[in-house]
């Protein structure tokens, strides 16, 4: 099965083609342009370098967030458009779940993504023999609250941190589009997806909206 994975959740635009869980090739680009300008040319370049066309793709996987609000919308919309026009399945994977796949050792995985002002997007997973089970659903909370939660619920456990939400504790900080594809493939073969239901995952309001609401409150 040939898989096209798309990640536009950060400044980096990343695409990859996999054969099941094996990477064929990936391309990443951060040239200062918007994802709406770079995504399609990057996909076309990737397909050409792999001697493939979109008709050869059997499964689409998109990062649904959390992350860049605009970037996520572009990636999800593109994935759904390909899915509808080519009649192939589309799987959505959260950034936090894809990050967890950076860790290969069994144990508890804390995935975090910085969302400014000492806050982070957060989710907790248990990896056991290649299976990633959710211990705590994705949410937005302060970095200090994440640490408190972990110390309270798992005081004697080793925690594997991944992502940039808690800089002092994190490693393997960046989402790998290859892992995004692998996570999507696993959901597909377990029939744990609904193509029509793929939607952006927003865990908090955009910063601009938060600032605007704060200014409006000051005027009241």
Regions found by a protein language model. Give the residues of each.
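N-terminal beta-alpha supersecondary unit
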Residues: 1-64, 140
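Generic hydrophobic alpha-helical segments
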Residues: 39, 43-46, 50, 99-100, ...
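Surface "functional belts" at beta-alpha junctions
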Residues: 22, 31-34, 89-176, 202, ...
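Residues at secondary-structure transition points
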Residues: 30-38, 69, 73, 77, ...
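Phosphate-handling active-site elements
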Residues: 49-55, 84-93
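DPxDG-like acidic metal-binding loop motif
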Residues: 59-90
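Acyltransferase
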Residues: 171-220
